[in-house]
Design a protein with these regions (language model features):
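Short, structured motif recognition centered on aromatic/hydrophobic residues
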Residues: 16-20, 92-96, 100, 119-121
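Beta-rich strand-turn-strand
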Residues: 84-94, 98-107
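A short beta-strand-loop micro-motif that forms or neighbors metal/cofactor-
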Residues: 30-45, 83, 105-122
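C-terminal end-helix/capping segment
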Residues: 113-139
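A positional/architectural concept
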Residues: 2-42
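Helix-adjacent hinge/juxtasegments
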Residues: 47-86
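Acidic/histidine-enriched, glycine/proline-rich intrinsically disordered or flexible terminal extensions
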Residues: 134-150
Length: 150
């Protein structure tokens, strides 16, 4: 099953609707459904959009974890607790809730990043800051990539 990949620049309309890029919609219609679960990313100030089946895998995994763990509680509250099921309309748009737009600091200009099983949705200026290759510890990353076999 092909996954999501690529970077797409887009904008939110005044009502908070976002056009899902055509390549992402094609993957969804071929392999998943016309719905996305949109939620907060656990640490970064962005949103994650999951196909329903991928979301189910994630929630099944979390439900098997120790619910007394502070990390699991945080993850559950931050990610699962803020999730909204969104239908992709005939124009290829989803309505991003006001609460999620606020949590992620989304203004009108956004970037959608395909990350295999999910899509990240960033405010353009926020993404430009975190994606700056001059701001990462390349040597440490090279070592970690090597240990991971990348």
């Amino acid at each position: 099953v092909p996954g999501f990949s690529g970077k797409h620049y887009n904008s939110l309309d005044p009502k908070g609707r976002l056009i899902i890029p055509a390549p992402f919609r094609e993957i969804l219609s071929s392999n998943h459904s016309s719905k996305l679960i949109i939620t907060n990313e656990v640490f970064d100030r962005c949103l994650c959009a999951y196909p329903v089946d991928e979301w189910q895998k994630l929630t099944d995994k979390v439900s098997r974890m120790p619910q007394t763990s502070d990390a699991v509680k945080y993850f559950t509250r931050r990610v699962i607790g803020s999730a909204v099921e969104c239908e992709i309309d005939r124009q290829g748009r989803v309505l991003v809730s006001a609460a999620l737009r606020t949590d992620a600091g989304l203004n009108s200009d956004v970037v959608l990043i395909g990350l295999c099983n999910r899509i990240e949705i960033w405010d353009r200026s926020e993404y430009d800051g975190v994606a700056d290759p001059t701001k990462v510890d390349k040597d440490a990353y090279k070592e970690e990539f090597k240990s991971l076999g990348l």
